[in-house]
Amino acid sequence: FGMDWFRHKSFDTSAPMGPWIVPAADIIDPQNLNLKTTINDEVMQEGNTSTMVFSIAELIVSLTRQVPLKPGDVVATGTCAGVGFFREIFLKPGDTMRLEIEGIGELNNPTI
């Protein structure tokens, strides 16, 4: 992976998180978590972290060669198959996007 992904995930308002963060110790296997993204309750993406191109460990090793990581830092890994850009599905005002990660929870974001 390249630092270009890091740059594209780091601009203002582009990385909603919460309402909580789960400590790494509470995640039994980060390489085996089910993921789902819906827009207005229609499934757009569904997958598992086991299918990631690079493992969490590989991402951290590569990233720390470029920048130091400190406690509390968040590493954005990307999404599973089904990215809307390639299907020309774009969010519009009034849409609600829901992201779910097994064992962590779900995040609901309205589009304004």
What is the predicted function of each stretch?
Residues 1-112:
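Catalytic-pocket segment enriched in acidic/His residues
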